[in-house]
Amino acid sequence: MFLVGLTGGIASGKSSVIQVFQQLGCAVIDVDVIARHIVQPGCPAHRRIVEAFGTEVLLENGDINRKVLGDLIFNQPDRRQLLNSITHPEIRKEMMKETFKYFLRGYRYVILDIPLLFETKKLLKYMKHTVVVYCDRDTQLARLMKRNNLNREDAEARINSQLPLKDKARMANHVLDNSGEWSLTRRQVILLHAKLERSMEYLPLRLGFLTGLAGIASLLYLLTRYLLPSPQLGNPGSKP
């Protein structure tokens, strides 16, 4: 099995593309969902965030106040690095747990929905393939203005706060162009899924895993045969 990192930009259509992959039966892990899960009350990351930033980052119900925490690390590289040092290991741990579940279920590849895949670069080394859901800037701007009921200035400000889609597209292995009709985008997704399914890149890991299991089974057999006492089949000195 191998990992496919998928990203996009605001109003590029990434969520719709993810839905098509899921309809095709693909395994999808949303890293944003994991990031929210690992900071829930009672989780190690939640406790460490409170220790590092104080109780002012908590809501009345004990949840992390994401806006307050965001304000605390805004333009504060040291604080941002501290927060990342708390959350990123937990995110990777949960990500690997979810990935292993899909591995055991026989999936050939798993899609990781990672909004900041190229910005943070932390997870890139785990990805066999990277996919960007792209659309041209004019289309992105028009969609965002309509979807969020924004004026042009506010919509442009939101787009400009992200790494440009054209830059992400240059860094990706695969680009799904969502600038035109949705039917064309959907066909691109179907073709990419077929290509990834045909890939043999999942075999080395699966063969290695099966080889490891065979080795463990052989070791257990030898230990059972040579180290445990043999059962008594009868008493040679007894009379019939």
From Swiss-Prot:
Family per UniProt? Belongs to the CoaE family.
Highest taxon of the source? Eukaryota
Which gene holds the coding sequence for this protein?
Answer: Dcakd
Q: Which GO terms are recorded in the biological process aspect for this UniProt protein?
A: coenzyme A biosynthetic process
InterPro entries linked: Depp_CoAkinase (IPR001977), P-loop_NTPase (IPR027417)
**GO MF annotations for this entry?**
ATP binding; dephospho-CoA kinase activity
Organism of this sequence: Rattus norvegicus
| Residues annotated as domain DPCK | 3-207
Write the protein's name: Dephospho-CoA kinase domain-containing protein
What residues bind ATP, as annotated? 8-15
Task: Name a Pfam family for this protein.
Answer: CoaE
